[in-house]
UniProtKB/Swiss-Prot annotation:
It catalyses: N-(5-phospho-beta-D-ribosyl)anthranilate + diphosphate = 5-phospho-alpha-D-ribose 1-diphosphate + anthranilate. Anthranilate 2 binds at R166. GO terms for biological process: L-tryptophan biosynthetic process. It comes from the Bacteria. Mg(2+) 2 binds at D225, E226. This is Anthranilate phosphoribosyltransferase. Gene3D superfamilies: Nucleoside phosphorylase/phosphoribosyltransferase catalytic domain (3.40.1030.10), Transferase, Pyrimidine Nucleoside Phosphorylase, Chain C (1.20.970.10). Belongs to the anthranilate phosphoribosyltransferase family. Its cofactor is Mg(2+). Pathway: Amino-acid biosynthesis; L-tryptophan biosynthesis; L-tryptophan from chorismate: step 2/5. It comes from Roseiflexus sp. (strain RS-1). GO terms for cellular component: cytosol.
Amino acid sequence: MPIRDQIIQIVRGHDLSEDQAAEAMEEIMTGMATPAQVAALLTALHLKGETDAEIAGMARVMRAKAIPVHFDAPLLDTCGTGGDGAGTFNISTTAAFIAAGAGAIVAKHGNRAMSSVCGSADVLEGLGVNIELDAASVARCLDQAGIGFMFAQKFHPAMRFVGPVRREIGIRTVFNILGPLSNPAHARHQVLGVADPALAEKMARALHLLGTQHALVIHGHGGLDELTLSGPNLVIDVRAGHTPRRYEVTAADLGLAPAPREALRGGDVSVNVAIVRGILSGEDQSARRDVALLNAAAALVAADRAADLRDGLHQARHSLESGAALARLERLITVSRGGEG
């Protein structure tokens, strides 16, 4: 079905099948669709509301068009959809180093700031990591540092057909939620944060359709795309071969002190670099450390390295206190810049 017919179908209020969504995405990612058609499809989907099948179909094509990173071991990604406008520091990036220090191999996929001041690419670059790596160099980082970073705009060249349209129409589209589903290393273990609670179930079902091994879809209290300390957090546990399981968890459930959202606030790149280093070095013992531990615990559960969040929290603490998390950062800086791990 040509993309023009799919636009008409969506405008009439009908959902696309997973295969139809993949066909539309194929036209977009190969440059066959005109900018007007891309804008119309994205806007119509946004107004109708994307289904899990539509999200999964488009994600399959985006994965297929990405430059692949080959690595023969189970990989974990920690990322979110963004868009929460909370101005927190780089929680999932900090948690990634803590999880790596506890033995998970982390293939982090991210970009520069979109809705925030400092994205994962920005803070990693500020920390001294070379973010402009090719696939072979990322695989080397995974092997020698236990963590690697894939700069989204470098690994998704087909996005050149979409970028100008997204900027011109100026609304959030399905592409804002496809990024976390399109890891170039095909990480099958994942923590995926969503700012919109209505999106959590859709993303969980999409991950299930995409054949994820183990993922935690999380929505933080107060509308964050991270687990927070301020109230009940939604978690949807998605495992291959199992029905997704939904539950809530608070900081107090795990013995962590509650803290308001304001306690997690970050700033520009220099501020967030100092925060991340402070946590990993053990100097920062504030609520920022606790929220990083909580999200690292979730990452370790998703990586199948922890039995539950309490066990994950215990391992995350050891990663920080032993210096293993900081060592992963230092090693990534060295290896990404061409040194030996």
